[in-house]
A protein has these predicted regions:
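Short, Lys/Arg-rich, polar N-terminal cytosolic tail immediately upstream
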Residues: 1-16
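Glycine/serine-rich anion-binding loops at beta->alpha junctions
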Residues: 117-127, 167-169, 244, 248, ...
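TM-adjacent membrane-interface loops and short helices in multi-pass inner/ER membrane proteins
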Residues: 226-267, 275-279
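Juxtamembrane loop-helix boundary motifs flanking transmembrane segments in multi-pass membrane proteins
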Residues: 7-11, 49, 53, 155, ...
Length: 373
């Protein structure tokens, strides 16, 4: 912004000259890509359910506008404000997740949503970044204050969130939260017994889900044996074959007419078919830019809380993208997880805006970090 001088002391000017503009540009490009891919994929989905062709495009644009406001507002905050915001979001989200278990509609066998007028809300999406920041704050406090049970507090923050995820059930998000928590414990330099405890809990939870939750067992069995209903994965793989390097052209793809979640969970397949390997590579690079730059800032940061929180948020953001892409390419069993900022979805878009807003706030250049609550 040429109009903003480095000597300008206004809030926006200080924000502009301290923000990671490469990450900001990558986030903006992902958001624009998401709208364009929704425009490519969603008319076919809209036709199948009997709504106007641009129904999902208009709705996604209505999500993008407040998401941009959230990114700007949250990225203006300092580390102390990020911690306070995370505490509020975490408590409210867990209360709403609990409410969803009792009054939320059952969708595909799970109680993850709350209906608020014409809108649906998935509280667990908002709890994810809040859980990461609070766990980082607890672990960092134990480093600053001898005797503070940081690992225990962080473990409780994780357990409360993961417990509600299991009750919904949502084993994919539980797995994501567990891996991120283990990574943060490792970065915090805690004893191996804590890592072993979380690792054992993750393995035990996965084995238990396989033996006691039929749809989990079904997905794993389909992946390993390639038997049963593998239509979505096979169709997705065929889309990449059809697309080749340059794609068949915008609007010319066929996968969106047969995949039920072409505009959400399998939007990467639409990108592969219509825009080819080249576009898919660009999307992966954009995710890589955000994650790598955040981790680089974390390495250079002296504040232990900022190190852990930025690393945790970046890991969660990158892992979610990797899981979605891996499912689309049949590298792991199917799991309904959105591609950040690219897949259609209101709760996902707004929660990811909160995530990257916190990440941008924590990685801003500042003279000294704010400590304490």
């Amino acid at each position: 912004m040429a109009l903003l001088s480095r000597t300008d002391r206004s809030l926006i000017a200080q924000w502009w000259w301290t923000i990671d503009r490469w990450s900001l540009a990558a986030i903006a490009t992902l958001i624009v890509s998401g709208v364009l891919l929704t425009l490519a994929a969603s008319p076919a989905v809209a036709g199948r359910i009997g709504v106007e062709p641009l129904h999902f495009v208009y709705k996604q644009l209505s999500f993008v506008a407040p998401a941009l406001i959230v990114i700007l507002a949250v990225s203006l905050a300092g580390p102390r404000d990020v911690r306070r915001l995370a505490l509020v979001v975490y408590v409210v989200s867990l209360l709403l997740m609990t409410a969803a278990l009792f009054v939320g509609p059952e969708i595909k066998g799970a109680h993850r949503w709350l209906l608020i007028g014409p809108f649906s809300l998935q509280p667990s999406e908002f709890a994810k970044p809040a859980f990461v920041v609070l766990a980082a704050a607890a672990l960092a406090e134990s480093n600053r204050t001898p005797g503070f049970p940081g690992a225990l507090v962080a473990g409780f923050v994780y357990a409360a969130f993961a417990g509600l995820l299991v009750l919904q059930p949502d084993f994919g998000q539980t797995m994501l939260a567990t891996v991120v928590c283990i990574a943060m414990f490792f970065l915090a330099g805690l004893q191996w017994r804590w890592l072993a405890l979380f690792g054992a809990a993750g393995v035990g939870g996965g084995v238990g889900a396989y033996f006691f939750v039929p749809h989990v067992a079904s997905r794993v069995d389909r992946y390993w044996t390639a038997e049963g209903d593998t239509f979505q994965v096979n169709t997705s793989l065929n889309a990449f074959t059809q697309g080749g390097f340059g794609g068949v052209g915008p609007g010319e793809g066929s996968v969106k007419f047969v995949l039920p979640d072409a505009h959400s969970d399998f939007i990467f397949a639409v990108a592969g078919e219509e825009f080819g390997l080249a576009a898919c590579t660009v999307l992966i690079v954009l995710f890589g830019v955000i994650v790598v730059r955040a981790l680089r800032h974390a390495v250079e940061e002296r504040d232990h809380f900022v190190q852990l929180a930025a690393s945790g948020l970046a890991t969660m953001f990158g892992l979610q993208a990797a899981i979605n892409i891996a499912v689309t390419l049949s590298l792991i069993p199917a799991k309904g997880m959105t591609l950040p900022f690219v897949s259609y979805g209101g709760s996902s878009t707004l929660a990811l805006a909160l995530t990257v807003g916190m990440l941008l706030a924590l990685t801003r250049r500042r003279a000294a970090s704010q400590r304490g609550w």
